[in-house]
């Protein structure tokens, strides 16, 4: 019979302090999950045990390549997860600390969400309390994320204990007033939704999850030249309404527990970064 690890022979409260130290992510509760670059994946390909998937390069070439996900190391101090491989009991205890005490930020690497949670056991998935996602502009025809978004929402239905989803929505509008509607009302959103306008199909998917206790909406607004096309006019008006009438529509009409959040996180959008977060 295998000897019990020394770690299990010390009081549980001491073990919790050890987990707290080893799984400290540089003093922050945030863990960023992202796609590995092509070069990173090729260098570590033979060692990976995680699910692999294909993504498109964010370049003009738009080539597809195989990759997997990884945790972005915290510059100040990286977690030491080796302790989780000692035995099953220690892994269960450490997993409880790792997944309940941290928020997982996927940014706009939505491709990583489904494999990340698919690689976890149902018990581990139920430990996750908080995640954040970056939703590219609903009118973004250059880098649409509609297929990934549908898969993400189906995956999130399996997170039975998810307390908080922070959704950063990309938008763009001119710095000065423009000719055309300056914002959208709740009635406007109702019309767009009822006609299945592409700008709100993502909300239909989000409403189908039904298990999230709180959805925090944050706008990431970039500068836009004076809008001249119908698509740009919709984008500008939509962007002005993300944290106001859109939140009201999501909450009151779709039953999503939405509220406005603080702009603490920016993703990487096709309009470029407008501020440092």
Predicted regions, residues:
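Short, surface-exposed structural microsegments at secondary-structure boundaries
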Residues: 1-130, 136-142, 262-277
């Amino acid at each position: 019979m295998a000897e019990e690890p020394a770690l299990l022979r010390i009081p549980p409260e001491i073990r919790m302090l050890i987990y707290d130290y080893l799984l400290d992510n540089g003093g922050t509760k945030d863990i960023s999950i992202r796609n590995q670059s092509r070069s990173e994946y090729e260098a570590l390909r033979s060692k990976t045990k995680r699910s692999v998937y294909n993504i498109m390069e964010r370049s003009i070439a738009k080539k597809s390549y195989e990759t997997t996900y990884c945790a972005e190391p915290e510059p100040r101090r990286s977690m030491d997860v080796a302790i989780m491989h000692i035995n099953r009991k220690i892994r269960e205890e450490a997993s409880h600390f790792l997944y309940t005490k941290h928020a997982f930020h996927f940014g706009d690497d939505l491709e990583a969400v489904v494999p990340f949670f698919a690689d976890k056991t149902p018990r581990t998935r139920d430990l996750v309390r908080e995640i954040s996602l970056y939703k590219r502009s609903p009118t973004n025809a250059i880098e649409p994320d509609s297929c990934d978004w549908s898969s993400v929402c189906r995956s999130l239905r399996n997170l039975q204990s998810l307390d908080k989803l922070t959704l950063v929505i990309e938008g763009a509008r001119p710095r000065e007033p423009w000719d055309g509607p300056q914002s959208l009302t709740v009635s406007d959103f109702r019309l767009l939704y009822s006609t299945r306008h592409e700008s709100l199909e993502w909300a239909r998917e989000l409403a189908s999850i039904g298990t999230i206790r709180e959805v925090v909406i944050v706008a990431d607004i970039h500068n836009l030249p004076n809008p001249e096309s119908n698509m740009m006019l919709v984008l500008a008006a939509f962007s002005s309404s993300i944290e106001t009438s859109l939140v009201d529509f999501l909450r009151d009409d779709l039953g999503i527990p939405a509220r406005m959040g603080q702009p603490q996180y920016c993703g990487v959008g096709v309009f470029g970064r407008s501020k440092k977060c």
